[in-house]
């Protein structure tokens, strides 16, 4: 069965068509600038055929029409017709407390996702637009919602509650939810396979280090704590997000800079993190280049980033009373040897030993610890699209 995986943003739509039996990516692409001038679809097949389609996309429905046209195109498509797509899997950012696993999309599911929009105003409305667009174009094809937050619904109360008046939780469901759950689950399960062990016997810490970054403690196969909170702003320093901060800083900046709360949160979400500290870029490649040139703020930034990751590893080792494996994944975790080296330099107390030769790897499965290391260190490339396809297949079946 071929499964179309959709990740819909407010002005973009990423897609992959995956053969759920072979798990091969048949085609993938991206629609950009939806609803604006200069909208474009970039499409690529497994055979290396490429297409760039510059067509007006006034809305996401038109974008989905163009995606289907690309997938079925005689020259650069990979299927003959819509009939060869068995199901659609949608990435949904926030499922709140309503969803602890993936769900078949029904009117009831859509209403529940809408009800979570207050918790993810930047993401859920866009995800819903993607669902409605696909329903309009692919009326009879079953669809599944896979939630970033679902994997973390196993966190105990002591891990997810904030020290705020309890009625705020009762009234507004203000608590820690966590994100990147699909990635953390995929990576932890694959790490257990790489180690040849049952995940139910392991304590694993997954470091998802990309432009967005989070750390998760996975004990016996379930998430017991994670670094992101009510929103993805909590936790690690990130590409443009500040991460953990004294909440009183918000009021302080508002007063000093004469900004509204919304404007200050925008700074913390979009102008902080690596971008804010370096003043150069949110892209780690640019930051590393600046480090090599001796840029002091870039050096401060990479050291701060690694330090924060190492602190969370220490916290989650305590939370689980030990750790068997530490995994590095996502853009930075998979591809930046020096970052892994910096983080590992803090792990001597765990008797975790990095093998410098094995660590010279990028974007592929690897055990990068020494044979004598008391804790396994791994590089495990994430594959959220494949994880979504697997969840979709589970619910839809053949």
Predicted regions and their residues:
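Glycine-rich phosphate-binding loop of actin/hexokinase-like ATP-binding domains
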Residues: 151-255
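Short glycine-rich, Thr/Ser-proximal phosphate-binding strand/loop in the N-terminal lobe
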Residues: 12-57, 229
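Extreme N-terminal starter segment of soluble prokaryotic enzymes
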Residues: 1-4
């Amino acid at each position: 069965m071929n499964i179309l995986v959709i990740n819909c943003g407010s002005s973009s739509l990423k897609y992959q068509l995956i053969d759920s039996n072979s798990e091969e990516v048949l085609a993938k692409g991206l629609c950009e600038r939806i609803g604006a001038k200069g909208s474009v679809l970039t499409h690529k097949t497994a055979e290396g055929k490429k297409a760039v389609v510059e067509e007006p996309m006034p809305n996401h429905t038109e974008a989905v029409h163009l995606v289907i046209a690309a997938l079925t195109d005689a020259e650069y498509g990979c299927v003959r017709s819509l009939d060869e797509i068995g199901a659609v899997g949608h990435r949904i950012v926030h499922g709140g407390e309503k969803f602890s696993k993936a769900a078949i999309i029904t009117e009831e599911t859509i209403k529940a996702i809408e009800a979570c929009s207050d918790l993810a105003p930047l993401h859920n409305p866009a995800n819903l637009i993607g669902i409605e667009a696909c329903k309009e174009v692919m009326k009879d094809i079953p669809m599944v919602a896979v939630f970033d937050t679902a994997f973390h619904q196993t966190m105990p109360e002591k891990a997810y509650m904030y020290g705020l008046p309890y009625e705020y939780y009762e009234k507004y469901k203000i608590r820690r939810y966590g994100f990147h759950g699909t990635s953390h689950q995929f990576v932890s399960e694959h790490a257990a396979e790489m180690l040849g062990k049952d995940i139910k016997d392991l304590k694993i810490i997954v470091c998802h280090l990309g432009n967005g970054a989070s750390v998760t403690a996975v004990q016996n196969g379930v998430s017991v704590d994670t670094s992101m909170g009510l929103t993805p702003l909590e936790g690690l320093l990130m590409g443009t997000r500040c991460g953990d901060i004294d909440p009183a800083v918000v009021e302080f900046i508002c007063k000093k800079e004469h900004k509204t709360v919304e404007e200050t949160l925008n700074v913390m979400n979009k102008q902080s993190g690596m971008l804010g500290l370096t003043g150069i870029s949110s892209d780690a490649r640019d930051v590393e280049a600046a480090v090599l040139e001796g840029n002091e703020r870039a050096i401060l930034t990479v050291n701060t980033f690694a330090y924060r990751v190492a602190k969370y590893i220490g916290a989650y080792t305590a939370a689980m009373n030990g750790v068997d494996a530490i995994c590095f994944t996502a853009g930075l975790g998979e591809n930046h040897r020096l970052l892994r080296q910096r983080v590992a330099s803090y792990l001597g107390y765990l008797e975790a030993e990095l093998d410098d030769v094995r660590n010279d790897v990028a974007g592929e499965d690897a055990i990068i610890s020494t044979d004598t290391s008391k804790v396994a260190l791994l590089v495990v490339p994430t594959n959220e699209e494949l994880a979504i396809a697997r969840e979709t297949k589970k619910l839809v079946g053949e």
